[in-house]
């Protein structure tokens, strides 16, 4: 069955803008999404809409579609005939074709050139205070290393890899292909040696010709003081082994910090909420406040309101790059007693009568604003 025109599928003109394409796709995708539309054929319709949007939303793909329609110019025309040798797939796009015409095919990397090993990632969980003060840790990671038996060659000891007879040691082969521009030659990775340019007749009994084995490596890591959740640290040269004598890759340690039940962290500052009694808030007091650095005495002035914040300078998180420490912010929460005996109630009534039981000007202003909000003023 022939494919419908992509513009027709989305119900737009060929001169439609990118915004018009996106708007049409959103409307149709909501209408035919399988989770919403249970009608027969809705699923296929949704796939057709998605395919059309994928082609028309990308400027390069759209230009290609406008010129060739549903015919893929990368597939050639007419095939290769017997013995044509057209294995290895089509072109990756116009870039490959122009590379072949203008010498870009020479970009093929030397298969025997040294290459850096792959990078690795390790997730380390830290307690709240471990992230603040740092720690020395030892981790174990599985990684690819050169085989000790064959020293990375992949060949049985006493033998050496031979030059690939299919690519002549180049690691690539030339493939002829028909294109809209004519018959061209393109380079492809040799499928017989996987681009290494070598053939191993007798494989190493340890690594079975791979030249590499997986080992578990213990690595000592120094976690710096002040790291935060989601940050990562690079450990140079502790990734996988390089290829053809190339350098090792790097290891990236990603930190996941376990939240604390009392302390909260924002950047290099720490926030805590401390309860005080009604009497302490009214008359003032000195209280002990826990910090990550130890206990600190904090003076509570008389008349302190709930939500008042006090700053303890230098009691936060050490700056990761050095030069200073953050602060700790203490947020006071005044606790009102829930149960009072008769004597306590009488004392409070007497207190209320002497003060007129009125809120202060600041609080009164708040209630005035609230009344206006209810009235819609």
Curated annotation (Swiss-Prot):
| Pfam families the UniProt entry points to | DnaJ, DnaJ_C, DnaJ_CXXCXGXG
Keyword annotations for this protein, in alphabetical order, are:
Chaperone, Cytoplasm, DNA replication, Metal-binding, Repeat, Stress response, Zinc, Zinc-finger
Zn-finger segments (CR-type): 134-216
Binding note for cofactor: Binds 2 Zn(2+) ions per monomer.
For activity, the cofactor(s) needed are:
Zn(2+)
Q: Which residues bind Zn(2+) 2?
A: 164, 167, 190, 193
What does UniProt give as GO cellular component? Answer: cytoplasm
Q: Which Gene3D superfamilies match?
A: 6.20.20.10, DnaJ domain, Urease metallochaperone UreE, N-terminal domain
Where does this one sit in the cell? Cytoplasm
**Matching InterPro entries, A to Z?**
DnaJ (IPR012724), DnaJ_C (IPR002939), DnaJ_domain (IPR001623), DnaJ_domain_CS (IPR018253), HSP40/DnaJ_pept-bd (IPR008971), HSP_DnaJ_Cys-rich_dom (IPR001305), HSP_DnaJ_Cys-rich_dom_sf (IPR036410), J_dom_sf (IPR036869)
Principal location: cytoplasm
Record GO terms (molecular function): ATP binding; heat shock protein binding; unfolded protein binding; zinc ion binding
**What does the entry's domain section say?**
The J domain is necessary and sufficient to stimulate DnaK ATPase activity. Zinc center 1 plays an important role in the autonomous, DnaK-independent chaperone activity of DnaJ. Zinc center 2 is essential for interaction with DnaK and for DnaJ activity.
Q: What is this protein called?
A: Chaperone protein DnaJ
Q: Which organism is it from?
A: Listeria monocytogenes serovar 1/2a (strain ATCC BAA-679 / EGD-e)
Source organism phylogeny: Bacteria, Bacillati, Bacillota, Bacilli, Bacillales
Q: State the gene name recorded for this protein.
A: dnaJ
């Amino acid at each position: 069955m022939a494919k419908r025109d992509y513009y027709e599928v989305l119900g737009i003109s060929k001169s439609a803008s990118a915004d018009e394409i996106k708007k049409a796709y959103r409307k149709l995708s909501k209408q035919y999404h399988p989770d919403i539309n249970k009608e027969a054929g809705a699923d296929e319709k949704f796939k057709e809409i998605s395919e059309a949007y994928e082609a028309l939303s990308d400027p390069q793909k759209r230009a290609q579609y406008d010129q060739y329609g549903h015919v893929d110019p990368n597939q050639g025309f007419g095939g290769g005939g017997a013995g044509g040798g057209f294995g290895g797939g089509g072109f990756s796009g116009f870039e490959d074709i122009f590379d072949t015409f203008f010498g870009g095919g020479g970009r093929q990397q030397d298969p025997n050139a040294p290459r850096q090993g792959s990078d690795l990632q390790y997730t380390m969980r830290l307690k709240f205070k471990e992230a603040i003060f740092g720690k020395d840790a030892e981790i174990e990671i599985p990684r690819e290393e050169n085989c000790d038996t064959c020293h990375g060659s992949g060949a049985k000891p006493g033998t050496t890899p031979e030059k690939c007879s299919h690519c002549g040691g180049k690691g690539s082969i030339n493939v002829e292909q028909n294109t809209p521009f004519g018959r061209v030659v393109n380079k492809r990775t040799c499928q017989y040696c996987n681009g290494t340019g070598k053939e191993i007749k007798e494989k190493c009994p340890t690594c079975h010709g791979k030249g590499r084995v997986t080992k578990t490596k213990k690595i000592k890591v120094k976690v710096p003081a002040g790291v935060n959740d989601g940050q990562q640290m690079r450990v140079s040269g502790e990734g996988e082994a390089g290829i053809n004598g190339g350098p090792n890759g790097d290891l990236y340690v990603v930190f996941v910090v376990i939240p604390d039940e009392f302390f909260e962290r924002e950047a290099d500052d720490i926030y805590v909420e401390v309860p005080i009694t009604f009497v302490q808030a009214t008359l003032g007091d000195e209280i002990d406040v826990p910090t990550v650095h130890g206990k600190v005495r904090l003076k509570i002035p008389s008349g302190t309101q709930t939500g008042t914040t006090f700053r303890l300078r230098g009691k936060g998180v050490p700056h990761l790059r050095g030069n200073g420490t953050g602060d700790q912010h203490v947020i006071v929460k005044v606790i009102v007693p829930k149960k009072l005996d008769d004597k306590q109630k009488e004392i409070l009534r007497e207190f209320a009568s002497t003060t007129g039981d009125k809120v202060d000007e600041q609080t009164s202003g708040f209630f005035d604003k609230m009344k206006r909000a209810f009235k819609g003023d």
